[in-house]
Amino acid sequence: MLNKNDIVEVEIVDLTHEGSGVAKVDGFVFFVDNALPGEVIRMRVLKLKKNIGFGKVDEYVTLSPSRNQDINATYLRSGIADFGHMTYTEQLKFKRKQVVDNLYKTAGISDVEVAETLGMKTPYAYRNKAQVPVRRVKGQLETGFYRKNSHDLIPIEDFLIQDKEIDKLIVFVRDLLRRYDLKPYDEKEQTGLIRHLVVRRGHYSGQMMLVFVTTKPKVFRIDQVIAKITEAFPSIVSIIQNINDKNTNAIFGKEFRTLYGQDTITDSMLGNDYEISAQSFYQVNTEMAEKLYQIAIDFSDLNSDSIVIDAYSGIGTIGLSFAKQVREVYGVEVIETAVEDAKKNAERNGITNAHYVADSAENAMAKWSQDGIKPDVIIVDPPRKGLTESFIKASVAMQPEKITYVSCNPATMARDIKRYQELGYELKKVQPVDLFPQTHHIECVGLLTRVER
């Protein structure tokens, strides 16, 4: 009979989709962080439930050849890089396996080509955005990342997967906050001033934005702080204050104030320029997002007569990237500010054949159908929860030749593809793309074509 704090020798037989090792002992399935298949470990029992348990590695008996032994354990503890203990080659294989397994288990698909995961040459320092909590640790203001499954801050200076200029700026600002005695937020007591630092940097432009998230509007000696920052970092074109006085896990409150420079930064993707605000959705890995979108374009096999619906269009990054190659693009997005941004981005890039509406995709498609619009391709890029049944039915009712599915969750993609197959579409091919190296997240593009009946 197992008890808490027992130490048992186990072999890791599998990995969960989030990268925890799986071991089986005495009728329990145990989940163990930082353990890989094939490894034998001495495991300390942390928690027991009815037939599952949680353990931690007390000692490694046998190491996997797939282990990256150079990773700093801080990155694993914080969740910054929950796959960092795997070699990058192994990460790419595992991510492809996730896609293959989900398609088979959920949709019964085993005969469709799933390509090798497209990875990065240098799978570090890729994030163009950082959201960093500011807290007091051991009596001192610190910036860092939360310990996994907690709100305990681990102080970190090198975030491994963030742009190095962003890391430098965060450390510089942290030191200024200490010097000017600006108080960090205390979540339990609901006191303090500085909650988060949010930084964005244009991959191509190099322009930087810094956002101070504060509990109150007034920040003592903020002008002096800004002068020091802009002197040290000439690439900063925007400093914003966001006021969040609520007891919430949400980073931003409703009010934004521009303290210095512009409201936005500018960057480019696939040849188009985009204005990016503090709250804009913009892919955090520009290099791999360009590859992801190019694959979606290639799968869609577009030409100058193509009419394309861009569902979940955001600020227009997918639709505008191919708008000049096709006849018309119709984009729909539920967030009104994103739609306004998409319209501005179309105008900025001299694109006149892209039309954006703020609505649910189902409603927009029903209206477009009534107006006689017949798309050749519908490109979908839904959130992690995937597509709704009403969306799937509305998209099928428009009878496009192709549906190109850009997914950030292989489980919901497989579920949705199963439904599309029941409604007369067939999955032709899938390309996984690694937008988030060192983490468990995986994106992929799937091509569905209409079956002639």
Language model: regions and residue ranges:
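Terminal RNA-binding accessory module
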Residues: 1-74, 107, 355
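Rossmann-like S-adenosyl-L-methionine
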Residues: 2-5, 9, 17, 217, ...
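Short, acidic/hydrophobic/Gly-rich beta-strand patch recurrent on exposed beta strands
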Residues: 21-26, 144-147, 211-213, 342
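Short, conserved phosphate/pyrophosphate- and ester-handling motifs at nucleotide-, phospho-/glycolipid
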Residues: 38, 162, 285
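Extended interfacial segments that mediate partner engagement and assembly in macromolecular machines
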Residues: 61-71, 75-184, 204
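Short, solvent-exposed loop/turn elements at beta->coil junctions and helix N-caps
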Residues: 115-122, 187, 196, 200, ...
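Internal alpha/beta scaffold segment
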Residues: 153-195, 216-240
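Carbohydrate-binding surface patches
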Residues: 198-202, 208-218
